[in-house]
Amino acid sequence: MKPVVALVGRPNVGKSTLFNRITRSRNALVDDFPGVTRDRHYVDAVWNERPFTLVDTGGFLLSDDDFFAREIRGHVELAIEDADIVALVLDGRAGISPFDRDLADILRRTSKPVFFLVNKVENHKQREELLEFYSLGIEKFYPMSAEHGIGVEPFLDDMVALFPAPEPVVEPQAGSEQGEPDASEQEICIAVAGRPNVGKSSLINRLFGKSRVVVSHVPGTTRDSVDLSIERNGRRFRLIDTAGIRRKGKVRERIEKYSILKSLKSLDQCDVALILIDADEGVTDQDITIAGYAQDRGCGALFLINKWDLLDEDRKDQRRFMEDLRTKSKFLSFAPAMTISALTGFRTHKILAMVEKIHAQYAYRINTGLLNRIVEDAIFRSEPPMHKGKRLKFFYATQVAVKPPTIVCFVNYPDAVHFSYHRYLVNQIREMAELEHTPIRLLFRAKTGKIDFSGKSKLAERIVEKKEKKTTRRKKERKEQSRRKRVRDLKG
């Protein structure tokens, strides 16, 4: 198991900047506003070929005056408890604060290795003014500038030197093959999205079985997208608790704008979006806007109607609620919906099973022969409209990607395919391939140059052949009906 390293410290000392520097990413939001990071971020990193998990925590405050201070302090304590190594980040510009002294005292009492990092030290003149940090009762500290990457390497070298010896790597035997994992083995990435204060963080904590993200009645508690991993029944899930997405007119703080951009980026990266809706408030325009973001990004989707337990019996009309949801979200007709309560756990145990079902379809590849038979049958049942007096001709279809299933149909006039016929073909593929819970992308391309049909279904030829057989059969039927009529007339 990889060692866990926790970055702790008071707000705005540069923990998130250091986190991003070490992980070579922009996973944590960075701003001059204190308290930006309110939750823990877990990201895998590597230094000198030694892998470890780095944890970025919220700013640690010893005071209980503020609700978030209490919650964040609890998260830091959990991070320290989970960590193998703790790094206390201090501010070289601001100097030592009473909070730094209290936190240093707490960390000295732990049996775990503790590194003291003095951040925001950009030049030698500043280094000469750092003697006061020895008053914390420490033997060694690491002056650095996380923003400019100065002095970070010595800390990382000493840190990985404390890691247990790496396990020997077993080389694969000659002749063995390692293919791409199938859908049942892949980690499923889930984004928990919704308006502020609909219960996203409460749901994450319910699925994990312990407090992982700050929960509050105050809208906008989660300002950053928080990545967490969980394993259930041998299957790994990566859950992203996104910042609440408000209407544009209500987004005022600069840091909140950053958070919303990260939430939208999380939808880009996820396999399945859990779209939370507040049952007490009903389906709002903003809920549908968020659902639209998920549709635009092509991820799977699952509607979760949260706080169902808060409704009185007169309002618990699930059929009416679902009808309203389906009417307003016709573009996500494939997305299933469930009523839940993140607070009490009502039906939450069914969520990950449904996510697995959605993901299996989201990552599904349709056999080319079956796909062409489905399209062939759909065209035979309902012919495409004419284009400038000429019939649209479909040559063949092939699936070019998964997540979501993406299909290309080669036709003679791709721009002439009407949106209603496009929708008809998607619905036929969804029904016949049993992909009722995943988005499907259907693209039309022109057949250019010579195409080798070997090994492919000659769709156009078979459609013409079917039509000719149908025409011949109808001629025979009409001829037989005419013959029988003449016989009846002669007998009459």
Curated annotation (Swiss-Prot):
One of its GO terms (molecular function) is GTP binding. PROSITE patterns: G_ENGA (PS51712). Residues 464-492 are annotated as: Disordered. Residues 3-167, 188-363 form the EngA-type G domain. GTP 2 binds at residues 194-201, 241-245, 306-309. Keywords: GTP-binding, Nucleotide-binding, Repeat, Ribosome biogenesis. GO terms for biological process: ribosome biogenesis. Residues 364-448 form the KH-like domain. Pfam families: KH_dom-like (PF14714), MMR_HSR1 (PF01926). InterPro entries: G_ENGA, GTP-bd, GTPase_Der, KH_dom-like, KH_dom-like_a/b, P-loop_NTPase, Small_GTP-bd. GTP 1 binds at residues 9-16, 56-60, 119-122. Residues 469-492 have a biased composition (Basic residues). Belongs to the TRAFAC class TrmE-Era-EngA-EngB-Septin-like GTPase superfamily. EngA (Der) GTPase family. GTPase that plays an essential role in the late steps of ribosome biogenesis. HAMAP family: GTPase_Der. Associates with the 50S ribosomal subunit. This is GTPase Der. It comes from Desulforapulum autotrophicum (strain ATCC 43914 / DSM 3382 / VKM B-1955 / HRM2). The gene is der.
